[in-house]
Amino acid sequence: MAEAHVTKVGIVGIGFIGSDHLHRLTKTVANVDVTAVCDIVPGKAQKALDQQGLTATTYEDYHDLVNDPNVEVVVCTANNEAHYEIVMAALKAGKFTFCEKPLALDAKQCMDIIDSEKKLGRRMLQVGFMRHYAPEYVQMKKMIDDGVIGKPLMMDQRHYNQTQPEEYDSSRSIIETAIHEIDIDHWLVNDDYANIRVFSPKQTRHVQNAKIQDPQIVMIETKSGINIINEVFVRCQYGYDIKCDVIGEEGVLELPTVPQVATRLNAQYSTAILTDWKARFESAYDIEFRDFINHVSQNESPVGPSAWDGYIAAVTADAALKSLAEDGAKQDLDFPSTPAFYTESEKVSE
């Protein structure tokens, strides 16, 4: 491998996750220099830098950051609506790009990104599906591939958030929340989806808008017949709760919970439940960025989740939204074969 050098990174979008990645890239990941930060809100980029005791060039227009010669790699953590245009601009500039999920708002936009990346002749983009790097999911993947529980038959999951603002509507529950399970399930069982249905149980009283459907039940069937159930509840109140059980012919795999110190006090035995994703997947985010930077710092293509993974997730999410709008009607799914551009680039990078 070529000798690594300090990679100059620019971050577009400095909200909650953007600020978290700013800290990660400057304090946790080696061989990185964050040289520029951009946010459309005046003064927000500088405020984030000041809060973390950092210095960098600040911009309000992402075009200025993308075209800055002192930026080699673009990290997109802007609002979902802006992902497409930022990624397209970064690829046009010929720069390695990391884009938080979702890659874009729909499958068509994802395919445009794929076409742009292909024109560059090699992989330049990684999508932030960080669960691929979570040690517990990696272990589950290996055990499934090794046939430890026989062939997978069913999956039972939940994705609960403590709360979300009123503007976090039914579509965002799919595009921003359920998208994680849509992606990771496809990766875990390595089986394309055949159809999807989304149902709405009784609405929680913690939603004031009658048009918002929370919770939701997402049901997916794969080509080989695996049945997947995912409960999505973004206002569960009690905490951030992730569950993944894979039921096979010979046994069951259970995703472990994050270890917490147990307390014996006042005639009670209890353990805490996390309240958000930040602590739950902190190590996955760290490993994800170390891997991404390790490759691009040596001018190598990234090997993590690709634009094609983003496309598969988007096609499925589009169908999920249609099912939700049609009161749970089954939506058939049919994916083209993975382009050789992606399978071959992954083999080369390995």
From Swiss-Prot:
Record-level Gene Ontology MF annotations: inositol 2-dehydrogenase (NAD+) activity; nucleotide binding
The species this protein was found in: Lactiplantibacillus plantarum (strain ATCC BAA-793 / NCIMB 8826 / WCFS1)
Similarity comment: family membership: Belongs to the Gfo/Idh/MocA family.
UniProt entry keywords in alphabetical sequence: NAD, Oxidoreductase
Pathway of action: Polyol metabolism; myo-inositol degradation into acetyl-CoA; acetyl-CoA from myo-inositol: step 1/7
Swiss-Prot/TrEMBL catalytic activity: myo-inositol + NAD(+) = scyllo-inosose + NADH + H(+); 1D-chiro-inositol + NAD(+) = scyllo-inosine + NADH + H(+)
Entry keyword annotation includes NAD: yes
HAMAP family, per database record: IolG (MF_01671)
Name of protein: Inositol 2-dehydrogenase/D-chiro-inositol 3-dehydrogenase
Protein task: Involved in the oxidation of myo-inositol (MI) and D-chiro-inositol (DCI) to 2-keto-myo-inositol (2KMI or 2-inosose) and 1-keto-D-chiro-inositol (1KDCI), respectively.
Documented EC number(s): 1.1.1.18, 1.1.1.369
